[in-house]
Regions:
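Domain-level signature for soluble enzymes in the chorismate/prephenate branch of the shikimate pathway
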Residues: 1-139
Length: 139
């Protein structure tokens, strides 16, 4: 073992973590990096897993979306937070940019259906309606 390996391992154990729901690169991950770049992000699949990560000591902090300026409050968080044992200590704002993508050569008038996550569709509904594009939840 190289002497630096022990130092790296010790520093790794000392690094505090911030749990978030989603994958690396998700908006919640971006919010973690913007608000607390000193913390190591810990990706979790669900909001329940984020809360469990903090309660079990796997992470010291959680980054949870409470509200979306387009979609409104995040109902799951308002249901989970009161019984979680966690409380809000800070907030950050992350701008969300939604892109409509298609295969090369397809132009906007050719698009008739947009598939996306169920939460995202209402956020893009005005644009979709203006362009006669049917919204369809991705499975």
């Amino acid at each position: 073992m190289h002497p630096n390996d022990a130092v790296r391992e010790k520093n790794k154990k000392m690094t505090k973590k911030i749990a978030f729901q989603g994958a690396l690169g998700a908006y919640s991950h971006e919010a973690c990096n913007a608000a607390r770049p000193d913390l190591e992000p810990l990706a979790c699949k669900t909001f329940d897993q984020v809360i469990a990560a903090v309660n079990s000591g796997q992470a010291e902090y959680a980054m949870l979306p409470v509200e979306n300026s387009t979609y409104g409050r995040v109902a799951d968080i308002h249901r989970l937070l009161p019984k979680s044992g966690l409380h809000i200590i800070d907030e950050t704002f992350t701008r969300v940019r939604i892109s409509l993508m298609a295969n090369q050569g397809v132009s906007l008038p050719d698009v008739t259906v947009a598939r996306a996550h169920l939460v995202l569709l209402p956020q893009a509904q005005k644009f979709l309606d203006e362009h006669d594009i049917r919204a369809e939840p991705a499975v």
